[in-house]
Amino acid sequence: MEEKQREKVVVIIGPTAVGKTKLSIELAKALNGEIVSGDSMQIYRTMDIGTAKVTADEMEGIPHYMIDIKDPEDSFSVAEFQELVRGHIREITKRGKLPIIVGGTGLYIQSVLYDYQFTDEAGDTAYRERMEKLAEEQGVEFVHKKLEEVDPESAKRIHANNVRRVIRALEIFQTTGKKMSEQLEKQKNELLYDVVLIGLTMDRTMLYDRINLRVDLMMEQGLEQEVKRLYQNGVRDCQSIQAIGYKELYRYFAGATSLEEAISQLKTNSRRYAKRQLTWFRNKMDVAWFDVTDGEKTAEILRYIEGKLQLKSNNN
């Protein structure tokens, strides 16, 4: 029997502020592509400035998916992300287009490309309800500490406010005796798609300068007002507000810090996150890195993708 041809996928990764959005639009135009956001925070409506969401003008008519699909109060799991993005890959491919995933959330992107299993076969409704009650009565930190005791790796990865996922990890351990973190690590080395992983990097000093500048620009664009609306609307203890740009300003609105200190912390956290992103991708995935310190490398990257996926661009 002839082996089913794997779907072609391009993935663009790299730290925040390195230029992924601009490159993705150029590649989509050249390769007849459509774009899927791989950022776990761009899914939230009304959280536009702080998540550096692509604007309608920037899209240049290229369809984008996985943006504005949840309210800030909603939780969102890696398993949901995996299912939705794989669906978009199928649909985009069926239309004869090339799926281009753009983003910086490493685990989420990895869960799509590799054979990560998030099965629902392990379930214990009574236990789940008991944990939900405990979270209500004793607080989310109490339940999170229980997870720390049995699966410290998952506890590190899952924020206490993401109660549903904390309880899911506890439930998996309760019913199977296996840690969720171990199950996530068990993946096939083989990619599910015919994929090209493009990574953008640049001189660290220049990158950090760009990140600082981006934060200043976000403040000019109204980030303070965007976060204030969420705060005044009573959005609390949610997964969404753990995003960089939101948690720092929440502390300001709660009276725990000055605006100046909050902005400084936001810059620091953004730089640290960029460093973690680079480290994660270098350690976990087979990425073709392109240094854009001296300017964009669109033509070079395009040639590389054409060669790897045996595609012809509209630029030829």
From Swiss-Prot:
Gene3D superfamilies: 1.10.20.140, P-loop containing nucleotide triphosphate hydrolases (3.40.50.300). It catalyses: adenosine(37) in tRNA + dimethylallyl diphosphate = N(6)-dimethylallyladenosine(37) in tRNA + diphosphate. Residues 39-42 are annotated as: Interaction with substrate tRNA. It is an enzyme of class 2 (transferase). One of its GO terms (molecular function) is tRNA dimethylallyltransferase activity. The record marks T105, R128 as: Interaction with substrate tRNA. Its cofactor is Mg(2+). Keywords: ATP-binding, Magnesium, Nucleotide-binding, Transferase, tRNA processing. Substrate binds at T16, A17, V18, G19, K20, T21. Its EC number is 2.5.1.75. GO terms for biological process: tRNA modification. Signal peptide: none annotated. It comes from the Bacteria. ATP binds at G14, P15, T16, A17, V18, G19, K20, T21. InterPro entries: Dimethylallyltransferase, IPT, P-loop_NTPase. Pfam families: IPPT (PF01715). Monomer. Belongs to the IPP transferase family. Catalyzes the transfer of a dimethylallyl group onto the adenine at position 37 in tRNAs that read codons beginning with uridine, leading to the formation of N6-(dimethylallyl)adenosine (i(6)A). This is tRNA dimethylallyltransferase. It comes from Bacillus cytotoxicus (strain DSM 22905 / CIP 110041 / 391-98 / NVH 391-98). The lineage of its organism: Bacteria, Bacillati, Bacillota, Bacilli, Bacillales.
